[in-house]
Amino acid sequence: MTPYLKIIKSSYTLLSFFYFIANTIIRTIQNVPTSHKIILVSLYYLVFSLFITRIFYGSPLKIISTYIYGKF
């Protein structure tokens, strides 16, 4: 298998995984009361934003502590 096909296969697998997780989250949210939906959506948004922050900027806790306490 060529390197390009490996990249395409791994990208497809990763997208399939995210699609499965998104569908699971959506089905879970649709089956709970409205007050719980707000809490779940907030929690999922927080986890997702921390995940994205960690990918691009490193540790979110380090960023927050640097913002609060200044440089180490």
Curated annotation (Swiss-Prot):
It comes from the Eukaryota. Signal peptide: none annotated. The keyword Magnesium does not apply. It is found in: Membrane. Coiled coil: none annotated. Its main location: membrane. One of its GO terms (cellular component) is membrane. Keywords: Membrane, Transmembrane, Transmembrane helix. The chain crosses the membrane at residues 6-26, 38-58. It is a multi-pass membrane protein. This is Putative transmembrane protein DDB_G0272126. It comes from Dictyostelium discoideum (Social amoeba).
